Structures are given as structure tokens and as C-alpha cells.
């Protein structure tokens, strides 16, 4: 066993991959029972959709990450298909999953909105767990902080993994803290654990959707819209703390914040449109 994973027969299984896989599995279980509870379509179709969606979601998540990190990958083409060490963007996976859902529902003659209201619950479970993969990879963290929630990461981790530039370029290395504990001493950076913030935000959103909004749902697709609003607002706020955001070229504009705004606006517009239609 290493800090990054478990070694079985000479093959190292990364914690990152195990957490992503666990997120898929638990998300599937939650969506299955949600479909069973709502009883609007055969719950077994949730399994069929997951099998159909896994590969496109992973490809989409990786493609999104590579596109917005092209300045690096254009000189490291062989690394494009290496995902064991991270580099999967949630937005890319969600977009690919949504496209796959549209095609799947068309072929199965299902309501995409009904199916989507069930799927977002599993999606949130996957996102809640998936962010902990970032913890083990020591990525997706925020700027310097000395608050109660500060996460300490040894600078040696970045040196050993050839990632020292990550904390030098954003000024975190200059703010590193030298800590002595007994006979041992190490240098740490102190950062916002943005992966934790997003994981907890999504947990609250999931609980609200399951225990509050599901019972009060007035039309198909309402839970999708609430997810878009809730996740969009949370992601926009939390993304502002991160030091590794994917940018639009050299503009300094964070891609994820733009998409978060689009999600929130879309969700709000959809709810207003549907509720206005109901009152007519």
C-alpha cells in the first residue's frame, strides 16, 4: 500500500480510481431506488443507462480537461489517455452523460425529464464521493488560508510527484509553513479544501432534493432544474477559491464559473417557464 493507492500483484490501483468507481456504484443504487419509489418507469433501465453512459462520461470528462489544458497536452500527447492520476473534469462528464441520456431515452421511448429527475440524485452521490478522489490526488484545492478549515499538504508531495510548479506559480510555496513535531519536521502549504466545500455543498443539495423538493415536485424536470441552480451557485462560489481552475485561453476567465452561471440561469428560466405554463 502506498500513499496513492493499493498494490495488488505488482499493479497499483489508485485511490482516485477506486473512489470514482465507488461513486458510480452508489450513484447507481440511489438512482435505482429513486426510480423504484417514483414508479414512473422500469427501475432496471437505470442499470442499462449506467452501462451505456460510463465510457462516454469518462471520455467527456477527460476531453473537457484536455481541451482547456491544451497548452500542456500539445507537448505531452502520450499523457492524454493517462487518467489514473486524475485529470477528469466533472462538467465534461455531465455534458457527455446528458447527451447519452437524450439518445438513451429516445431509443427507449422514455421521458428524458422523468428519467433525469431520478438520475440527478445518483449524479450528486457520484459528485459527493468523486471530490474525495481530489483529496487523495492532492488536487482541486484552493488558495492560502489559515482558517479553521485549512488543509495542510507537505511540499515534499509535490516535489516527489514532479508537481512543484503548481504551488510555485500560484505563490503557495512562498507561504509554506515549517512545522516541527517531535523529532520530525516538514514544510506544508495551507489551503482551502475546496474539494470538501463542494462535497458538503452537494450533500446538502442532495438531501434537499430527496427530502424536500421531490415531495413538492410539480412537473417533470423540476429536480433537474433545481440541481442546475443549486450546483451552479455552489460551483461558481467555490471555483473562485481554487488555484487550478481551467481558463479560457489567457483571459483569466474561469471556464467552470461561466458554465456554473449558465446552469443556474437555465435552471431558473426552466422553472419559471414551466410554472407559468401550469398557471395558464
Locate each region found by the language model:
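A feature for loop-to-transmembrane-helix boundaries and adjacent hydrophobic helices
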Residues: 1-280
Amino acid at each position: 500500500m502506498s500513499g496513492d493507492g493499493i498494490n495488488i500483484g505488482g499493479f497499483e490501483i489508485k485511490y482516485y480510481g477506486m473512489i470514482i468507481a465507488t461513486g458510480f456504484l452508489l450513484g447507481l443504487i440511489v438512482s435505482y431506488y429513486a426510480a423504484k419509489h417514483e414508479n414512473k418507469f422500469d427501475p432496471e433501465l437505470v442499470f442499462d443507462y449506467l452501462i451505456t453512459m460510463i465510457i462516454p462520461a469518462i471520455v467527456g470528462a477527460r476531453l473537457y480537461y484536455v481541451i482547456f489544458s491544451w497548452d500542456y497536452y500539445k507537448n505531452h500527447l502520450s499523457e492524454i489517455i493517462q487518467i489514473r492520476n486524475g485529470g477528469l473534469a466533472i462538467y465534461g462528464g455531465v455534458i457527455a452523460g446528458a447527451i447519452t441520456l437524450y439518445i438513451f431515452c429516445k431509443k427507449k421511448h422514455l421521458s428524458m425529464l422523468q428519467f433525469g429527475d431520478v438520475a440527478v440524485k445518483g449524479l450528486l452521490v457520484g459528485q459527493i464521493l468523486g471530490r474525495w478522489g481530489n483529496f487523495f490526488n492532492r488536487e482541486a484545492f484552493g488558495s492560502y488560508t489559515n482558517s479553521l478549515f485549512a488543509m495542510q499538504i507537505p511540499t515534499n508531495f509535490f516535489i516527489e510527484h514532479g508537481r512543484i510548479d503548481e504551488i510555485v506559480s500560484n505563490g503557495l510555496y512562498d507561504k509554506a509553513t515549517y512545522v516541527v513535531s517531535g523529532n520530525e519536521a516538514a514544510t506544508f502549504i495551507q489551503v482551502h479544501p475546496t474539494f470538501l466545500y463542494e462535497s458538503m455543498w452537494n450533500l446538502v443539495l442532495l438531501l434537499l432534493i430527496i427530502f424536500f423538493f421531490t415531495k413538492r415536485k410539480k412537473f417533470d424536470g423540476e429536480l433537474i432544474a433545481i440541481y442546475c441552480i443549486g450546483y451552479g451557485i455552489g460551483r461558481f462560489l467555490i471555483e473562485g477559491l481554487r488555484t487550478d481552475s481551467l481558463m479560457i485561453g489567457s483571459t483569466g476567465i474561469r471556464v467552470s464559473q461561466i458554465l456554473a452561471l449558465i446552469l443556474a440561469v437555465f435552471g431558473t428560466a426552466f422553472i419559471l417557464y414551466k410554472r407559468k405554463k401550469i398557471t395558464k
